[in-house]
Regions:
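Acidic (Asp/Glu-rich) sequence patches and key acidic residues
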Residues: 1-98
């Protein structure tokens, strides 16, 4: 089951992909996809510490991070990773089940 994790007050916090890239032990990957001839960047975040990779898609709007999407059943690990990022970058979040 997938889940969406949204940042509270993301417009005020102004967290960017560059901010996420600055956190130690976290890897941000950019994938460029073409949709109807238009290139679109999709960002994923990986935790390098755990043996099994955890992948979260980063939701961005006008350069600001507004949330993350998890497509697997690793809820506890995703929650811990986002909590870790929240501590490092000073943001709070909530989960929206989909």
């Amino acid at each position: 089951m997938s889940s969406i994790y949204k940042l509270r007050d993301f417009e005020k916090k102004r967290i960017t992909v560059a901010d996420l890239k600055s956190v130690p032990d976290v890897l941000v990957i950019e994938e460029v996809k073409k949709c109807f001839g238009v290139s679109t960047s999709i960002y994923f975040i990986f935790d390098k510490i755990w043996e099994n990779k955890l992948s979260l898609e980063i939701g961005c709007s006008q350069g600001l991070v507004y949330g993350f999407t998890r497509y697997d059943d690793k809820h506890e690990r995703a929650y811990k990773l986002i909590s870790f990022l929240g501590e490092k970058l000073n943001f709070d979040f909530y989960e929206v089940n989909s």
